[in-house]
A protein has these predicted regions:
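A metal-dependent, Asp-based hydrolase signature
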Residues: 41, 46, 52-97
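Short, acidic loop-to-helix structural element flanking the phosphoryl-transfer center
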Residues: 64, 68-69, 87-127
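Residues at secondary-structure transition points
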Residues: 38, 62-66, 159, 163
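Alpha-helical elements of Rossmann-like donor-binding domains used by nucleotide-donor carbohydrate transfer enzymes
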Residues: 24-28, 46, 73-77, 98, ...
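Asp-based, Mg2+/Mn2+-dependent phosphohydrolase catalytic module
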Residues: 1-7, 113, 117-120, 129, ...
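Active-site neighborhood of HAD-like aspartate-dependent phosphohydrolases
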Residues: 2-49
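Active-site loop signature of alpha/beta-hydrolase-fold enzymes
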Residues: 14, 109, 210
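Short helix-capping segments at alpha-helix termini
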Residues: 31-38, 81-89, 145-149, 177
Length: 213
C-alpha cells in the first residue's frame, strides 16, 4: 500500500486573493492618492501589512481584534507618513468602512482550482490551515467553490495557538504521522519558514524548499 501524501495550504493570500481589498482602495481612493504622488498599490500593501501585523500582535497578547476592525485606525497611518496633513479629512469614514468590509469579499486566486484538482489526481489529501477566524475563512472557500472538507479545515483558534508558533505546525504533522510526503504551501515567507522548521517540505513562490527536521 502506497504511503499517504498530504499538502497543507495556508488560505488567505495563498488560495484566496487580496484583489477585492486592493480594488476597493483603487475604486474609492486611487485617483486621489495619485494626485498626491502616492502609488495606490504601495498604499494598499502598507495598509494590508500594517493591519495584519497589528492583528498578529493582538493575538499574541491574547486580545484578538478582527482585521476588519483593526484596519480602520491603521488606514490613516500610511497617509500621515506620506505627507497628508489631515488624513481624516483626506478620506471619508464611509470610504474606510467600505474598504474594510471589502475584506469579507475576497475571492479565489487564479489557478487554485486546477492546482487542487491536479494534486488530488496525484494522490494528495488537501488540508487548510488558517490563522484567520474560522467562519470568515470557510465563507471565502464556499463562495469561491474551493472544496476542502470541514474535517480537513483547521483554524488556529481550534489549536489554541497562532501562526507562526511551532505548536500550530506540529499539531498538523501529528495528524498524519505515517505520511510518505507532507507539504506546506504558503505565500508568506514567515509562515513557510515556520512550517519548514517544524518538518514540512515547502512549496512557495514556485520553489521547493528542502525538508529540514
Amino acid at each position: 500500500m502506497a504511503a499517504s501524501k498530504h499538502i497543507v495550504f495556508d488560505i488567505v493570500g495563498t488560495c484566496i486573493s487580496y484583489d477585492a481589498f486592493f480594488n476597493a482602495i483603487e475604486e474609492h481612493l486611487g485617483d486621489k492618492l495619485r494626485q498626491h504622488g502616492i502609488p495606490p498599490r504601495l498604499f494598499e500593501l502598507l495598509v494590508l501589512e500594517g493591519g495584519e501585523r497589528e492583528c498578529l500582535f493582538s493575538k499574541i497578547a491574547r486580545h484578538s481584534i478582527p482585521f476588519m476592525e483593526m484596519i480602520k485606525p491603521v488606514f490613516y497611518r500610511p497617509l500621515a507618513m506620506s505627507g497628508i496633513e489631515n488624513p481624516h479629512e483626506f478620506t471619508a469614514d464611509e470610504d474606510v468602512t467600505y474598504v474594510a468590509e471589502s475584506y469579507r469579499r475576497l475571492g479565489a486566486r487564479p489557478g487554485i482550482h486546477e492546482c487542487m484538482r491536479r494534486l488530488r489526481e496525484n494522490g494528495f489529501t488537501i488540508w487548510a490551515l488558517t490563522s484567520g477566524d474560522k467562519a470568515r475563512v470557510q465563507g471565502y472557500l464556499k463562495a469561491a467553490d474551493i472544496d476542502i472538507p470541514s474535517e480537513n479545515f483547521i483554524a488556529c483558534e481550534m489549536i489554541g495557538a497562532t501562526k507562526p508558533e511551532p505548536e500550530v505546525y506540529e499539531h498538523m504533522l501529528k495528524r498524519f504521522p505515517d505520511a510518505g510526503e507532507t507539504w506546506f504551501a504558503a505565500c508568506h515567507m514567515w509562515d513557510a519558514a515556520a512550517a519548514k522548521r517544524s518538518g514540512c517540505v515547502l512549496y512557495t513562490d514556485n520553489h521547493t524548499i528542502a525538508q529540514k527536521r
